[in-house]
Amino acid sequence: MVTLNDIQRNPHINMFIQRSKEALSFYHYTDHGFDHVNLVAKRAKELAKKIGLSKREQELCAIAGFCHDMGNFIDRIDHEYWGALLFFEVFKDKIPPKDLSLIMQAIANHDNYKAKVLSPISAVLILADKSDVRRSRVIIKNRKIIQTDIHNRVNFAVTSNKFKVDPKKQRITLQLEIDTDFVPVMEYFEIFTQRMVQCRRAAKFLDYKFGLIINNFKLL
């Protein structure tokens, strides 16, 4: 059985992630490298465990989380599909077809806002990925340059990110602290509305509700 540890040691996967980080850094994008994918993998596995998925499903969620952005080095556009195809090429002879298809599906759907959530693996990955907004994802250190891009501004403004799961209330909550001196809360919604809609859909698929709290104010 292939595990997350096996995936993390695979030279092809590591190179794809490194190249993707370099490609997006060239355009001053937020971090999509190892810090991001390791956090998403960890968050996905923890979420899967808390909502009661099997140990194998937990591992599939973690694997999908680690590999979800590795198609960016080919092209940012449709990177989710490139990532799924790359995963197939590397592991088609190493992972059972059912598990392989679930991971590929999750990778392919994670950044497609029009796609329907079709499995718990996909739902968990969406929630783990779209909830990762934080200052440390901003690669650029020059504040003047940061101010020129709304994605960098919003991520830089987030000083605290807490992802909470309450199985009893069946509620998943993203709690953020935002420096409103750097960016108004409304700018968060300018770029993250679609992502929050995705999170709500994903949570609903899991029979959970998704909540958003910013600066101790409940918005969802």
Predicted regions and their residues:
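Acidic/His-rich, divalent-metal-binding segments that scaffold phosphate/diphosphate chemistry
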Residues: M1-D78
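Charged/polar, solvent-exposed surface patches and flexible loops
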Residues: M15-E22, E89, Q105, N109, ...
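Alpha-helical structural motif
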Residues: R9-H12, F16, D99, P120, ...
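Terminal helices and disordered tails flanking the catalytic cores of nucleotide-processing hydrolases
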Residues: D132-L220
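Divalent metal-dependent catalytic cores for phosphoryl transfer on phosphate-bearing substrates
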Residues: F26, K49-V165
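Non-transmembrane, amphipathic alpha-helical segments
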Residues: Y29-H32, K116, E187, I191
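Aromatic/hydrophobic pocket-lining residues that form π-stacking "cages" and hydrophobic walls in ligand
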Residues: A44, V124, C199
